[in-house]
Every structure is written in structure tokens, then in C-alpha cells.
Amino acid sequence: MKLAIDIEFIRHAMLVVASHRFWMLPFSTLPWLAFQYYVTMDDPTKIIGPGSVQGTLLGVPLTGLGMFFGMRIIAGEIDDRSLEIAYTVPGGCERLWFAKLFSAFLMLLFTEAMLAILVYFLFTPFPLGALYGALQASCFYMILAMALGALFRSETSGLIGTAAILGLNGLLTGFGENQLRFLPFFNPYLYLDASGSSNVVDGGFTSPEELLAWTIQNRIAMLLLMGAILSLGFMRANRREIMLDGM
């Protein structure tokens, strides 16, 4: 019985985040794949290799969707004038926000699975680790959008702040040309693509063991950073008087 109640609560959270047509949102990422497919068909020299799957084909649409979910989790309650109701949820408002996060995560998983199948058959096979890398970036920016939405008490302001940080990420990495292992979009498979056409040193690392160490460092650091941002976002949202001021 408790499982049924929890599932119903998560379903309700999903409806609050993305309305009754939430099932359509994963399909909003398909135009991006269609555009990339058109580009590769129009210019055969623009080949998308396995190393580009994580960022170009999966990471970009998933991150956009994650940012939308993130801005809706807490700031959506403010813009909908329903935040005061969230504070009265049995078990605390965090229970509702965690349910929203989990429902958004499930939608991201479904979207990634759908995109991965299409990419595999329409573009190129790719390593399974690329799925985690793309999901990591989307979850990071989802949590960041949630926290900034709570900080600025606005969906729009939170989204603008998140987009600015995403743009800075793009500038630092040359929009995927350079890989920095302390950023959420770190893609080790681009190094492997580079080393496949030259030598390992030219690919940017000295050994596969070093590349593995960089990848593990990135994954652990991003998990810790996401946990810290999530905690700060909830701390801000729990300041009830400030959050409700002016509503």
C-alpha cells in the first residue's frame, strides 16, 4: 500500500513539474537529433564519431531538458503562487521537492534511453560510459537551475543564471574542443578519438590509466558538487519568511 501511495505521489510531482502532457517532453529533444542527422547527410565530411556522442548528440538536448525541469522544481511553486502549500506537505516540503527531482530524473532517463537507441542506429555505436557522462551534465544543470531558481525566487532569473554558467562552461572548453576534468561536461572519449588518429601523448594524456583516473576524479567531484548545490538550494528554500515575502 505504501508503495502505491509513493508512486502516486511521484506521479503528482511529475504533473506539477511538467503538466499533464509531461509524456511529450522527452520527444521535444528529437528535433536536435533530426538537425544533426540533416547536417551529416548534407555534408558527408562532417562525421560524428563515438567520442562526440556524449556531448553533441546526448548531452546538449538532455541538459536543455534538465534545465527546464530544474527551474520548475522550487521556483515553479513561486511563480504558480503555490509555495505556501508546499510548506504544509506532510513530511516536509523537502519530500515534495525530492519527489519532483526523482520524477524529473526518471524522465531524463527515459529521454536518454530513447535518444541512445536512435543515435546507435542512425549515427554510430558508442561506449556505454557516454550515457553516464551525458546524464551527469543534465543532472548537474538541473540541480543548478533548481538552486538558482530558489535563490532568485524566479523561474526566469534562475534559468538565465544557469544559461550564463552553461555559456561560461562552453567558453572555457571551446564548446567541446577542450576537455577540463573539473567541469560537468568532461568527455574522456574525445581523448580516445584524438589518440586514435595520432599518438597517446598528442591525445592529451600520457596513459589510459591516467585518463581513467581523470574520469573517476570528475565523476566523484561532480557527485559531491551536486550534493552541495542541492543542500544549499534546499537551505535557501527552507527560509520560509524570505521565500514568501511579496507573495
Predicted segments, located by residue:
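Hydrophobic H-region at the start of alpha-helical membrane spans
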Residues: 22-29, 58-60, 220-226
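Secretory targeting signals
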Residues: 29-66, 70-73, 98-170
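Aromatic- and glycine-rich beta-strand/loop motifs that create alpha-glucan
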Residues: 1-27, 242-246
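Juxtamembrane loop-helix boundary motifs flanking transmembrane segments in multi-pass membrane proteins
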Residues: 1-10, 46, 93-94, 123, ...
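Helix-loop-helix units of permease transmembrane domains in multi-pass membrane transporters
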Residues: 71-105
